[in-house]
Amino acid sequence: MTIKSHVLRGLLATAVASLVAGPALAANIFVIGGKPDDPFWSRVKKGAEDAGVVAEAQGGSVTWLGPQNYDNLGPDAAELIRQAIDQGADAIVGPDWVPEAMDPAFEAVTAAGIPLVIYNAGGLEAADKLGAMNYVGAVDYKSGFAAGEYLGNAGHKNGACVNTLPGAANIEAFCSGFNDGIIAAGGTGSVLQLPATAFGDATAVAQAVRAHLLQNPEIDAMFAIGDGDTNATVSGIQQAGKAGQVHVCGMNFSDTILANIQAGSQDCAIDQQGYQQGFFAVSILNNYVNYGVTIPTREILTGPGIVDASNVELVIEGVKAGVR
């Protein structure tokens, strides 16, 4: 049995037992996440809310707080963390997207004696630095590295990472990992950096990709940081007349991305299993607040995994259910 299986079985067993026994203290858990129309974060939110069913049955609650956009990501997220403290959170979950802006707010969480789990961004290093109980998520650098290595090993040697959230530590790590991965496979890597306002703007991303490819015809591989940006990157490649010549891998996926992988217009997607990030983080804190239960495996990894033509059919049902 894998470590992940042990962790999942432990969480589920504790959740069932806690429903029978009844809580010592109802946990009001606040979760900091992405903006409302971000497809990846909708899956994270579903995971948090599904875990919240147990918390609510015990008289607790799960409250989701997210920014309206990513234009001022670090300061906006820090303000959401402070709001959670002010609203009397018993426990807080949050990603360490922009450490220089967000770490003082996280430090205020632990200084107030509020249990904290870092998820999605920051890794165990951030959890250690901030005094968090656990880190739940993928290792961002390794996710990018997996994409670069995959495309490089497939024979594509000139890669570019499309970064639409400059300054976000996890996105910078994606791109750094991608470049190192394709270099390790004998290629070269670079970054196409766009302003944060371009994130989720399909037209802006597609136009930028088209222009970049026309200016840099040697590029034959691209990596995008989210499912919306990946779709836009595929569109930009097509607009540049480079379909079949420039190969794409992206973070996360959706119905459209899986269809693109089936059709051959996208090579792979990196799966960080956002649903599990939300589910595990909330479950850990609910059990801790109510019963003092801890998970000794402090780094709970949900990725990276690779979805490509070899396993895409197995993933489709999970996407239909809204959990992958």
Predicted regions and their residues:
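Hydrophobic alpha-helical
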Residues: 82, 90-111, 178, 197-260
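Hinge/beta->alpha junction and helix N-cap segments in small-molecule ligand-binding domains
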Residues: 33-45, 62-77, 97-98, 121, ...
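Flexible loop/hinge segments that line or gate small-molecule binding clefts
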Residues: 99, 104-142, 252-267, 316-317
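Hinge/cleft segment of the Venus flytrap/periplasmic-binding protein
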Residues: 166, 170, 182-185, 190, ...
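Bacterial N-terminal signal peptides that target proteins for export
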Residues: 2-12
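Sec/Tat signal peptide C-region and signal peptidase I cleavage site
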Residues: 20-26
